[in-house]
């Protein structure tokens, strides 16, 4: 199924529209790098667009714009549709978390008069890619009195950055050079250099004490306070255009913030009341299996759908309404997929692999080997999506995750399908996924926005 490169047929006006849309996305992904930051941004923008806190409303009716928030990391936005909600909803679900490093509960140590922050990697990273890379420290810490302190260090002009120092090639022959890629550095050694100046004292660990003193002076944070913290270490720096033609975007966290951004913008831009209730659901913890109380496996979806239906049905409410609403719904698992990387093309079945710049990929299934752990969308749903995209002149392509026995992976699709929701994976293709600098196409970004908006409208 060969297709011409879609860029060729675009007018200058269409190209400008795509490039202009991409500029705001670049600003977004440069600034908001953690799940808390993304959730906060989404809530702030939703309020400006007229969305109200559903927990404070007693009744809901068609056209109402509402939001739900779960522990400052997971958020849902809904526009109540014209049709009875038990006839089904249209959901787009993306995730706010990205692979990163997390600080350990007792993280600060001194070794050879240098101070390090000990970490535990989060999600599927290639550990060696994080060596000698400028890093930013972000997150929240609760002090012993319960006060919340937010930190964001490494991305402002006058901020320091932080580094995991690599070994020089002159001395790496025995310790590193002949090892497998996942053994180049042990997870326990992903320690971030954060200080080197000592303090004048008779105590040991003079540099650690000096670093802790600086942290306390600026942020009121003491060493024990790290126990009640969520400190995330992410790549420093901003999104960049890639290539002379500037048609690609390089940035950290595009898995899955490219889908977060496009699903948000598309629901915010709906001009008319949709036929079916439209839901934009941004969830946490996808990169580690959707676990925890803010992950999709927590049943928060069932909670807020039940609350919506109760406020619509009032005295007529019963649990069967909830089950019917979920069972009759359609969902897009809005997550990125792996584009063909010409340097490593052998891992793909090229006939079934997406390319950068060919539109939004439709991925019927993910999983491993024999489709293990996949939700595997039914042909009827794929047909519906295909017709929807064609009807709206939206560029699309097919996608699978590599050759059959090459590897594999999963998304939130199986958790949505567990409610009986008909679900398909559909998100832009990415090169260098899970790296500190992921690459996407501006054309695919814009067509994801168009596709999600068309889906909400139905």
Swiss-Prot record:
Protein's UniProt keywords contain Membrane? no
Pfam families assigned: Peptidase_M18
Which keywords fit this entry according to its UniProt record? Aminopeptidase, Hydrolase, Metal-binding, Metalloprotease, Protease, Zinc
Record InterPro entries: M18_aminopeptidase_1 (IPR022983), Peptidase_M18 (IPR001948), Peptidase_M18_dom2 (IPR023358)
GO-annotated biological processes: proteolysis
Q: Which CDD domains match?
A: M18_API
Statement: the UniProt record of this protein carries the keyword Zinc: yes
HAMAP family registered for this protein in UniProt: Aminopeptidase_M18_1
Name of the protein in its database record: Probable M18 family aminopeptidase 1
* Source taxonomy: Bacteria, Pseudomonadati, Spirochaetota, Spirochaetia, Spirochaetales
Gene symbol here is apeA
């Amino acid at each position: 199924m060969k297709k011409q490169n879609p860029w060729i047929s675009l007018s200058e006006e269409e190209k400008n529209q795509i490039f202009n849309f991409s500029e705001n996305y670049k600003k977004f992904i440069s600034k908001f790098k953690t799940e808390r930051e993304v959730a906060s941004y989404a809530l702030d923008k939703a309020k400006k667009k007229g969305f109200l806190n559903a927990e404070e409303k007693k009744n809901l009716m068609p056209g109402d714009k509402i939001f739900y928030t779960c522990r400052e990391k997971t958020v849902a936005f809904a526009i109540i549709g014209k049709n009875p909600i038990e006839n089904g909803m249209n959901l787009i679900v993306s995730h706010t978390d990205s692979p990163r490093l997390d600080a350990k509960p007792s993280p600060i140590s001194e070794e050879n008069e240098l101070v390090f922050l000990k970490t535990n990697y989060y999600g599927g990273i290639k550990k060696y890619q994080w060596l000698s890379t400028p890093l930013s420290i972000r997150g929240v810490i609760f002090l012993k009195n319960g006060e919340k302190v937010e930190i964001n260090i490494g991305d402002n002009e006058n901020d320091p950055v932080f580094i995991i120092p690599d070994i020089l090639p002159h001395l790496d022959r025995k310790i590193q050079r002949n090892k497998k890629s996942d053994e180049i550095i042990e997870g326990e050694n992903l320690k971030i250099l954060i200080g080197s100046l000592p303090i004048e004292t008779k105590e040991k660990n003079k540099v650690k004490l000096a670093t802790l003193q600086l942290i306390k002076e600026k942020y009121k944070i003491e060493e024990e306070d790290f126990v009640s913290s969520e400190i995330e270490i992410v790549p420093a720096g901003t999104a960049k255009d890639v290539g002379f033609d500037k048609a690609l975007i390089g940035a950290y966290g595009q898995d899955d913030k490219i889908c977060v951004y496009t699903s948000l913008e598309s629901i915010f831009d709906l001009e008319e009341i949709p036929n079916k209730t439209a839901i934009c659901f941004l969830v946490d913890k996808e990169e580690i299996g959707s676990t925890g109380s803010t992950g999709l496996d927590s049943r928060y979806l069932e909670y807020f759908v039940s609350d919506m239906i109760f406020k619509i049905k009032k005295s007529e409410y019963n649990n069967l309404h909830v089950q019917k609403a979920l069972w009759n719904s359609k969902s897009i698992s809005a997550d990125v997929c792996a584009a063909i990387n010409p340097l490593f093309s052998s891992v793909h079945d090229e006939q079934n692999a997406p390319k950068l710049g060919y539109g939004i990929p439709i991925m019927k299934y993910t999983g491993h080997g024999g489709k293990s752990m996949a939700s595997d969308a039914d042909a009827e749903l794929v047909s519906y999506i295909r017709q929807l995209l064609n009807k709206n002149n939206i560029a699309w392509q097919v996608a699978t995750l590599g050759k059959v026995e090459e590897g594999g992976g999963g998304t939130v699709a199986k958790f949505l399908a567990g409610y009986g929701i008909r679900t398909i994976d559909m998100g832009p293709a990415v090169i260098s996924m899970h790296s500190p600098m992921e690459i996407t196409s501006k054309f695919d970004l814009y067509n994801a926005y168009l596709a999600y908006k068309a889906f909400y409208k139905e």
